[in-house]
Swiss-Prot record:
Signal peptide: none annotated. Coiled coil: none annotated. It comes from Human immunodeficiency virus type 2 subtype A (isolate Ghana-1). Keywords: AIDS, Host cytoplasm, Host nucleus, mRNA transport, RNA-binding, Transport. The lineage of its organism: Viruses, Riboviria, Pararnavirae, Artverviricota, Revtraviricetes. This is Protein Rev. Residues 92-103 have a biased composition (Polar residues). It is found in: Host nucleus, Host nucleolus; Host cytoplasm. The RNA-binding motif binds to the RRE, a stem-and-loop structure present in incompletely spliced viral pre-mRNAs. This region also contains the NLS which mediates nuclear localization. These overlapping functions prevent Rev bound to RRE from undesirable return to the nucleus. When Rev binds the RRE, the NLS becomes masked while the NES remains accessible. GO terms for molecular function: DNA-binding transcription factor activity; RNA binding. Residues 16-24 are annotated as: Homomultimerization. A motif (Nuclear localization signal and RNA-binding (RRE)) lies at residues 35-49.
């Protein structure tokens, strides 16, 4: 029941944000350059107030903390293969190798 109330409250908040957004159109119309500039400046301030109000009305939940699986995947993604040195071309001969070859 509590989840349903939260969902309805969220929908109401989103409806309010949408209504506020629709009632704040971008300014159009004739006028001098300073009049158009002032209209744009006032509209920008209204937009910033709308965004601030929307942030107060609807705050996003904190992202989930990384699970052990996510951390393991990130560790695997950070692995790199380092270049190995070339193997030696001439091997030293030892007595144990010669004995095996003769028998």
């Amino acid at each position: 029941m509590h989840e349903k109330a939260d969902g309805e409250e969220l929908q109401e908040r989103l409806r309010l944000i949408r209504l506020l957004h629709q009632t704040n159109p971008y300014p159009h119309g004739p006028g001098t350059a300073s009049q158009r500039r002032n209209r744009r400046r006032r509209q920008r301030r209204r937009w910033l107030r709308l965004v601030a109000l929307a942030d107060k009305l609807y705050t996003f939940p904190d992202p989930p903390t990384d699970s052990p699986l996510d951390r393991a995947i990130q560790d695997l993604q950070r692995l790199t293969i380092h270049e190995l040195p070339d193997p030696p071309t001439d091997l030293p001969e030892s007595n144990s190798n010669q004995g095996l070859a003769e028998t």
